[in-house]
């Protein structure tokens, strides 16, 4: 098989990233201290990121940076500053949730490759077209999809020059990524801001079935589903786990690397998955991939199940087990973990992410060119001015001036450590422009002979007036029994359509056709036939206006020329998100996210003729 399958690994800190690299990851994804959906991970500084990129590239491994949270209005300046820094790194892509960030990157930082985060809940073909339109080159498909759905969506993605990722190992959430508000509502920590409190792992009152953790799903594992994922032409197999340590990352990535290599080389799978059970797990399920959604997907233990698994395997072999044997099994598991950990530490011990030191030596002699010699552990080169130095009594170059002009180097992976002025004579003149040109050329060479991209100032968005002088009333109904309200008010009445149409949507087509003032309200999740039926509603009713929480339906409405409004579950939280929807897909208005407060909403600037 000639097609490359990317193994994409998590990196919550520098050690975990090193572990992923030596274990055979083709790419790693990691976050900085801000703007990423794993605040509980250690994360990286910008200097560490640059060192990680250099190290990863030496091993043929790519680095993707997670900027996968929604952004608040006051954060525009901070994210713009960061993007200005990122364009002068060699980062291979950024992983994005915020719709406004797509707009900023597409307009002002087009050299950055943008990947759509799992937080964008991508599960139907319209959403892939939507994301391609706003600038995504890769999408992460929702974990809830089955294999035929993944295959179909990957085909659609490839038709639009978009790559697909699928999570193949790690934690599963009880809700769709990007559509879980339990943490936000219960304790005020939004998962869309990287602060999920994991309510699905909490203990609740014991259920009738005797479970204390009724929302706790087993971990995802597609270890034996590799042939089907290859057949689906998925581009990237993604491992979850940026909160996990280096030992976990190394073990999982190493196990998956061997599985992929075995299948690519021989067409055969490795049957032994025991190492996956030796690191943190909640037992495993592939129920979503198989489309087999049952109670067996759940486990009444949110903590590490590796010890329970080892004891169960020993019990199966012997039909019974004693306390002494349990202790022996425990010791064996700890020893196995130690072996894997020591193997990992031996491999990463000498991996270095520190910046390469640079020493500058200057030479200034009358009648000769001004010379700068650049020395690094990996390369040395010398540059000269075009003009010859002249003796003068005034305006001569000085050590102080040279130190100021050469106070640093504009390179993400180099640091200036020393200046040597011992060969610089006093009382000599050289045009300052030539000194600046030499500095720029040094930066160019140290930057891999790539021009340093200049700082971009993102202009403030204009403030357009409200469409209506005063706020208007509207209401949302979800039941036929509430249709009488339609006759007693002049307010806009939205009719909430279900996530699942069970068989067909004829019932809802009849309701909407009989009540033309009703405005269809589409849900956030529409998979497979439910998406097809939702599209059929648009095609048969051709409503004048809709509200949609699903970007796939938004794209279809845009194609059909139907006026559409973004629902609150599209998670719009800033002005640039509204600009994206208006400029790219002719959106007419938006319900701002329910997760931000009145003070945060007040500063959002609407596009022209755009209703909030």
Locate each region found by the language model.
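Active-site PLP-lysine loop of aminotransferase-like
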Residues: 123
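Surface-exposed amphipathic alpha-helical tracts and adjacent flexible/coil segments at the periphery
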Residues: 1-22, 27-34, 38, 53, ...
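Glycine-rich, highly charged phosphate/nucleotide-binding loops
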Residues: 44-49
């Amino acid at each position: 098989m000639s097609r490359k399958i990317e193994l994409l690994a998590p990196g919550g800190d520098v050690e975990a990233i090193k572990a992923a690299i030596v274990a055979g990851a083709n790419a790693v994804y990691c976050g900085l201290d801000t703007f990423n959906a794993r605040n509980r991970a250690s994360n990286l500084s910008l200097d560490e990121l640059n060192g990680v990129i250099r190290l990863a590239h030496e091993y043929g491994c790519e680095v993707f940076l997670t900027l996968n949270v929604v952004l608040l209005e006051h954060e525009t300046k901070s994210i713009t500053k960061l993007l200005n820094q990122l364009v002068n790194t060699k980062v291979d892509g950024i992983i994005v949730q915020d719709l406004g960030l797509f707009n900023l990157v597409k307009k002002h930082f087009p050299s950055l490759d943008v990947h759509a985060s799992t937080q964008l809940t991508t599960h139907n073909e319209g959403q892939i077209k939507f994301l391609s339109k706003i600038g995504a080159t890769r999408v992460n498909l929702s974990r809830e999809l089955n294999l035929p759905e993944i295959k179909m969506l990957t085909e659609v993605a490839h038709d639009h020059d978009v790559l697909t990722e699928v999570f193949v190992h790690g934690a599963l959430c009880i809700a769709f990524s990007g559509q879980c508000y339990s943490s936000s509502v219960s304790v005020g920590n939004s998962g869309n801001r990287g602060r999920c409190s994991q309510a699905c792992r909490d203990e609740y009152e014991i259920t009738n079935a005797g479970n204390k953790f009724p929302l706790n799903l087993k971990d995802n594992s597609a270890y034996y589903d590799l042939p089907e994922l290859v057949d689906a032409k998925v581009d990237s197999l993604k491992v979850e786990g940026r909160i996990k340590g280096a030992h976990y990352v190394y073990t999982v990535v190493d196990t998956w690397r061997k599985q992929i290599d075995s299948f690519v080389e021989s067409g055969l799978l490795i049957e032994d998955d025991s190492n996956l059970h030796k690191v943190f797990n909640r037992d495993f399920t592939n129920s979503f991939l198989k489309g087999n959604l049952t109670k067996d997907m759940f486990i009444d233990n949110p903590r590490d199940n590796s010890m329970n698994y080892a004891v169960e395997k020993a019990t199966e072999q012997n039909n019974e087990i004693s306390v002494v044997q349990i202790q022996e099994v425990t010791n064996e598991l700890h020893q196995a973990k130690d072996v894997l950990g020591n193997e990992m530490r031996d491999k990463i011990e000498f991996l270095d992410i520190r910046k390469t030191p640079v020493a500058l030596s200057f030479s200034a002699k009358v009648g000769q060119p001004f010379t700068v010699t650049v020395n690094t552990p990996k390369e040395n080169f010398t540059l000269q001015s075009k003009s010859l130095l002249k003796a003068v009594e005034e305006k001569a170059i000085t050590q102080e001036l040279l130190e100021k002009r050469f106070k640093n180097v504009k390179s993400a992976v180099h640091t200036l450590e020393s200046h040597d002025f011992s060969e610089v004579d006093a009382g000599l003149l050289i045009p300052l422009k030539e000194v600046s040109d030499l500095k720029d050329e040094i930066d160019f060479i140290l930057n891999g002979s790539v021009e340093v991209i200049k700082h971009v100032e993102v202009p403030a968005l204009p403030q357009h007036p409200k469409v209506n002088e005063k706020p208007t009333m509207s209401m949302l109904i979800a039941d036929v029994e509430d249709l009488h309200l339609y006759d007693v008010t002049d307010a806009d009445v939205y009719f909430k359509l279900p996530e699942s149409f069970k068989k067909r949507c004829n019932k809802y087509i009849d309701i909407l056709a009989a009540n033309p003032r009703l405005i269809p309200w589409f849900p956030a999740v529409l998979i497979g036939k439910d998406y097809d039926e939702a599209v059929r509603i648009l095609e048969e009713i051709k409503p004048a206006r809709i509200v949609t929480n699903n970007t796939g339906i938004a794209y279809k409405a845009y194609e059909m020329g139907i006026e559409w409004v973004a629902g609150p579950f599209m998670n719009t939280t800033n002005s640039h998100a509204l600009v994206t929807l208006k400029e790219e897909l002719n959106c007419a208005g938006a319900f701002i996210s329910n997760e931000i407060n009145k003070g945060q909403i007040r500063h959002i600037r609407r596009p022209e003729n755009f209703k909030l």
